[in-house]
């Protein structure tokens, strides 16, 4: 065991067109819809996953929802990056509480 093993954690990410899974220690810790809600004017991410899905079609015109994957392929790299970062943060919060 190296000195930096304390600071690292192995995770697996399954990017799907409908859902994205994040797995650590052989457990699914994140299972969220593959969708991002962004502010059209600022480009800021407002929500990811279930929260973004709840906003789909029901929000102000300045908020857009994006499905970053189409037919199993990344269609919007920026949105996919935001989604992955957000889901990793959720994973890290989950594992730090465990």
Task: Give names to the regions the model predicted.
Residues 83-90:
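Phosphate/ATP-binding catalytic cores across multiple sugar-kinase/actin-like superfamilies
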Residues 94-98:
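Conserved small/polar residues in nucleotide/adenosyl-binding loops
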Residues 1-82:
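Early-domain small/polar-rich strand-loop-helix modules and first-structured segments
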């Amino acid at each position: 065991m190296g000195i930096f093993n304390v600071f690292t954690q192995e995770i697996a990410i399954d990017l799907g067109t409908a859902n994205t899974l994040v797995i650590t220690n052989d457990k699914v810790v994140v299972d969220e819809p593959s969708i991002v809600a962004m502010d059209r004017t600022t480009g800021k991410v407002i929500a990811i996953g279930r929260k973004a899905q709840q906003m789909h079609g029901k929000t102000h015109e300045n908020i857009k929802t994006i499905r970053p994957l189409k037919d199993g392929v990344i269609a919007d790299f920026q949105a996919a990056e935001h989604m992955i970062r957000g889901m990793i943060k959720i994973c890290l919060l989950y594992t730090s509480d465990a």
